[in-house]
Amino acid sequence: MPPMIHDDQPLEKWRDGVMTRMRMSALLGSKQLCVFDQFCDHGLGAPTHIHAVEEILEVIDGVAEIWLEKEKMIVRANQSVLIPAGAKHSFRNIEQKVLHVRASLAASIFEASYEDRAEISRRWSPSFDTA
């Protein structure tokens, strides 16, 4: 597999004030990993949700307030949090500058169950050829 040029991947708007760039998923040939960057404006991030697999949330730049079950923590650049499979979690940007986080999930597609059912729960899933 040739090297991946991450900047060639498009930025996607996931919700107001949150842009996402997929770095690796089933769409790029991954079988067991999904990795993406998110760029979140002040006060914004990811609403409460769970995944069926483990996730690592790493702060690349900025400061995040992360909720993991009932625990709230402040996470800074070059720090990460392991989110166990099935654990409720969320995060938000608590600084004025844009928060850059990297999420790595132990699955090749993004799947989540959100408290807010209006959120899109599945992304980067390959299409099935029906021909």
Please identify what each model-predicted range represents.
Residues M1-L33, S113-A131:
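A short, N-terminal "cap"/entry segment at the start of jelly-roll beta-barrel domains
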Residues F36-H51:
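Conserved short histidine dyad/triad with adjacent acidic residue
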Residues T48, I66-W67, I83, H89-E95:
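Short beta-strand His + acidic residue motifs that chelate non-heme Fe in jelly-roll/DSBH
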Residues A52-V53, E71, A87-K88, K97:
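A generic "binding-loop/recognition-motif" signal
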Residues E54-E55, V59-A64:
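Glycine- and acidic-residue-biased ligand/ion/polar-headgroup-sensing regions
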Residues K70-A85:
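Short acidic-glycine-tyrosine-enriched beta hairpin
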Residues L82, Q96-Y114:
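A short hydrophobic beta-strand segment most commonly corresponding to one strand
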